[in-house]
């Protein structure tokens, strides 16, 4: 995993995108579930590869495609996906030279924390097959999954992403993966920080 710089940082966005994904037509029945995280993260990665613009998610807490439940305002899976994207993926986009294919949508950016290194997102959209990546050194891994595609609760490294009793956000911490082969199970979205 040695990406080449694809575009330089540009703080003046050129494209502003609204009504993306599930917003058109009132949303889909799975927009509030883990199943939609694949679309959301793929959209963020693909959009970043072509512009430094902005994606506006038009609904915070209304209907099925809102980031929060419209009844109790609990964060849905896409909320946590966008939160992790913003915490991990930096503004400089790298070309991974990996073609998008089933089982491996690979995106690479600078690290959002400003430290040297690279942040990757690998989306394994295969419902049945794992995929493998090679890590050149130990890495921090945030692996998103769920008990079922239509689950309303997403897991990060096996821990449910739900609010605490005091409505605080959960602590989202990585696990360390040693250098070498890392197997990514089917139907997972994995952030890898090197």
Question: For each predicted feature, which ranges?
Answer:
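C-terminal non-catalytic regions of proteins with extracellular/luminal or membrane-system context
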Residues: 86, 93-98, 132, 168-169, ...
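Aromatic/acidic polysaccharide-binding cleft in carbohydrate-active enzymes
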Residues: 17-108, 116
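A structural micro-motif
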Residues: 13-14, 53, 139
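Carbohydrate-binding surface patches
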Residues: 101-137, 141-148, 187-191
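Acidic, Ser/Thr/Pro-rich beta/coil linker or hinge segments at domain junctions
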Residues: 135-184
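Short, well-ordered loop/turn elements at secondary-structure boundaries
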Residues: 11, 49-51, 114-117, 185-187
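Glycoside hydrolase catalytic-domain groove-lining segments
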Residues: 1-25
């Amino acid at each position: 995993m040695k990406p080449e710089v694809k575009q330089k940082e540009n703080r003046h966005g050129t494209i502003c995108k609204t009504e993306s994904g599930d917003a058109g037509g009132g949303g889909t029945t799975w927009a509030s579930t883990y199943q939609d995280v694949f679309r959301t993260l793929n959209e963020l990665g693909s959009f970043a590869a072509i512009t430094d613009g902005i994606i506006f998610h038009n609904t915070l807490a209304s209907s099925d495609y809102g980031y929060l439940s419209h009844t109790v305002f609990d964060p849905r899976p896409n909320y946590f996906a966008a939160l992790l994207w913003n915490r991990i993926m930096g503004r400089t986009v790298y070309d991974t030279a990996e073609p998008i294919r089933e089982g491996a949508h690979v995106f690479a950016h600078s690290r959002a924390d400003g430290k040297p290194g690279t942040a990757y997102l690998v989306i394994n959209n295969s419902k049945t097959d794992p995929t493998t990546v090679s890590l050149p050194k130990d890495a921090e891994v945030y692996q998103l999954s769920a008990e079922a595609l239509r689950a309303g609760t997403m897991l990060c490294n096996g821990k449910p992403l739900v609010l605490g009793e005091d409505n605080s956000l959960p602590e989202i911490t990585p696990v360390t993966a040693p250098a070498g082969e890392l197997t990514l199970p089917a139907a997972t979205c994995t952030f890898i920080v090197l």
